[in-house]
């Protein structure tokens, strides 16, 4: 498993005299390592939502009760590893998501895939998920989700489709689910994923291909409605 690689010393780059909100992630992390706690606040605000969503969907239904703990542990690891971060390695976002991925996968392996009683039943969560990936699931056929001004009928359909998508994601093997989320929800390239997860390029492509195929099969009833209505 890949973990942040310590370095003997990190020379803190000079940070341009710009507002923290406009600084790239790597510079913010270097500034934080140099003692600027405000830089960490910007990093947290910028990536809190995406990291939490990734951890929540990767852990899935059976470990929903452990999402907050893994999410908080991710940030603790980021804080404690601040002096080992090097901008010559992976970009900060890739580095941070790798930490979250490794912690979540450790928790999944330790769980033995046993179902946890606590279950999220969040229509907004499902709707958000299906909005993000509907275009990829349709593969150019039909019309992706546009929930800007849905009718009551459309809203009900998409909430139902969203709940189904979350259930389908939960049925994927852990490595395929992680690859799908990183690539299709969070925008990581195959090359970045291979480097971050310390696996081969073709391995990542295979996980994506098989995961997407399974999701399309699992979502077939909903996807057929979209294709027919296009």
Question: How should each PLM-predicted stretch be described?
Answer:
Residues 38, 90, 187-188:
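Residue-level signal for the short linker/turn that defines the boundary of a DNA-recognition helix
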Residues 69-76, 90-102:
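Structural recognition of an alpha-helix C-terminal capping motif at a helix-to-coil junction
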């Amino acid at each position: 498993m890949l973990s942040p690689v310590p370095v003997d010393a990190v020379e803190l780059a000079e940070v341009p005299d710009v507002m923290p909100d406009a600084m790239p992630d790597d510079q913010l992390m270097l500034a934080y390592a140099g003692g600027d706690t405000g830089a960490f606040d910007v990093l947290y605000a910028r990536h809190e939502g995406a990291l939490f969503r990734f951890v929540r969907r990767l852990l899935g239904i059976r470990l929903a009760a452990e999402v907050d703990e893994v999410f908080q542990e991710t940030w603790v690891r980021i804080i404690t590893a601040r002096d080992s971060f090097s901008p010559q390695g992976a970009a900060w976002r890739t580095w941070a998501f790798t930490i979250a991925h490794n912690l979540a996968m450790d928790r999944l392996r330790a769980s033995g895939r046993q179902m946890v009683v606590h279950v999220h039943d969040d229509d907004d969560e499902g709707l958000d998920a299906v909005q993000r990936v509907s275009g990829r699931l349709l593969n150019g056929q039909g019309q992706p989700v546009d929930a800007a001004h849905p009718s009551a009928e459309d809203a009900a359909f998409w909430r139902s489709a969203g709940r189904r998508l979350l259930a389908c994601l939960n049925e994927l093997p852990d490595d395929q689910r992680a690859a799908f989320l990183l690539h299709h929800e969070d925008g990581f390239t195959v090359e970045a994923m291979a480097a971050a997860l310390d696996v081969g390029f073709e391995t990542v492509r295979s996980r994506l291909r098989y995961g997407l195929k399974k999701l399309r099969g699992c979502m077939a009833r909903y996807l057929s409605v979209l294709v027919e209505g296009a």
